[in-house]
UniProtKB/Swiss-Prot annotation:
Protein name: S-adenosylmethionine:tRNA ribosyltransferase-isomerase
Catalytic reaction equation(s): 7-aminomethyl-7-carbaguanosine(34) in tRNA + S-adenosyl-L-methionine = epoxyqueuosine(34) in tRNA + adenine + L-methionine + 2 H(+)
InterPro entries membership: QueA, QueA_dom1, QueA_dom2, QueA_sf
NCBIfam families, sorted: PRK00147.1, queA
Signal peptide span: none
Organism: Pelodictyon phaeoclathratiforme (strain DSM 5477 / BU-1)
Record note on quaternary structure: Monomer.
Top enzyme category: transferase
Protein origin, superkingdom: Bacteria
Lineage: Bacteria, Pseudomonadati, Chlorobiota, Chlorobiia, Chlorobiales
Similarity comment: family membership: Belongs to the QueA family.
């Protein structure tokens, strides 16, 4: 398949630039992946589409302070966003502005060196001193809202670009399918008999970068660390034998479960099942684990859009997106959601 098959026109007014006034007050488009039928609902009514015995899997990662502003000797401001958290001396960053190899930057009296330009808008940065780049971001960094929002982070983002069940720090982007999940909705689902459990996948900004290769087979996928509790593996095995459904809340959960799918079959013990998900899911992929997917409306040419198309079917997803655009749904991280079953 070609990357252009996943392009569509997304105008600025369709992008949700801010979270809704109240968490969970967004819309929900429900798509039947077998028939292509579409139902318009609200996110708060998700319980109507779940059944007793279903297993809801959530990502409990917490977003780091991963956005930092630096300046060049000319005074030009450069925005830096961590692509992943490592304990290395050098880290890859997504940048906005003009940089070249050898440039020196200043960030809060700390000198930085651009050691390499890796790709379009991606550089490798080193700190000229004893402090690590991760430490610098942790001390001075801000909320890493996505670049496509085209604004600086504000106070509202500190709370709303984090899920209500965020626990383990490590992500440089939020698992956005869960941003509208509320404690009240989770309680409603529990009362209905829906089981729920968390895994951890630390999200890198590479998740949201567009695919630049013309042929999907030429795209090199980024890696993201994940940890799946042994209890979740057992719950999945049980659900698969009792007729329940494994419901992935987000593409991050999907990537972790599908990457670990083959190992789950023979996994034993109490230790978590860990790995680095570098799986690239696009149409033609045969899903092993998940039965339903709760996700947002994604950017054109993105790997998360391709994953969603693989699960829903390209034609069904294309039709659903067209209806969502016509009906005024809000797109991307702070926008409305889809439930695909």
């Amino acid at each position: 398949m070609r990357t252009g098959d996943f392009d569509y026109e997304l105008s600025e007014e369709k992008i949700a630039k801010y979270p809704p006034a109240e968490r969970g007050s967004t819309r929900l488009l429900v798509l039947n992946r077998h028939s292509g039928a579409v139902v318009h609902a609200s996110y708060a009514s998700l319980d109507l589409f779940l059944q007793p015995g279903d297993l809801l899997v959530l990502n409990n990662t917490r977003v780091l302070r991963a956005r930092l502003y630096a300046s060049k000797s000319t005074g030009a401001r450069i925005e830096l966003m961590l692509l992943e958290k490592h304990q290395e001396e050098q880290n890859r960053v997504l940048y906005r502005g003009k940089l070249k190899k050898g440039d020196k930057l200043m960030a809060h009296d700390q000198e930085l060196l651009v050691t390499d330009i890796v790709d379009h808008g991606i550089a490798r940065i080193a700190v000229c001193g004893e402090r690590s780049l991760s430490d610098l971001f942790e001390r001075f960094g801000g909320v890493p809202i996505p670049p496509y929002l085209k604004r600086d982070a504000e106070e509202v983002d500190r709370e709303r670009y984090q899920t209500v069940f965020a626990e383990l720090p490590g992500s440089v982007a939020a698992p956005t399918a869960s941003l509208n999940m509320t404690s009240e909705l989770l309680d409603t689902l529990r009362r209905k008999g829906v089981d729920m459990v968390t895994l951890t996948l630390h999200v890198g900004l590479g998740t949201f970068l567009p695919v630049r290769a013309d042929a999907l087979e030429e795209h090199v996928m980024h890696r993201e660390y994940y940890s799946i509790p042994a209890t979740l593996v057992e719950k999945i095995r049980k659900v698969k034998t009792t007729g329940g459904r494994v419901i992935a809340v987000g593409t991050t959960v999907t990537r972790a479960l599908e990457h670990a799918g083959e190992r789950m079959e023979t996994f034993t013990g109490d230790a978590p099942l860990t790995g680095e998900a570098d799986i690239f899911i696009y149409p033609g992929y045969q899903f092993r684990i998940i039965d339903c997917l709760l996700t947002n409306f994604h950017a054109p040419r993105s790997t998360v859009l391709m994953l969603t198309a693989a699960f829903a079917g390209p034609d069904h997803l294309r039709n659903a997106y067209q209806k969502a655009l016509e009906e005024g749904y809000r797109f991307l991280s702070y926008g409305d959601s889809m439930f695909i079953a």
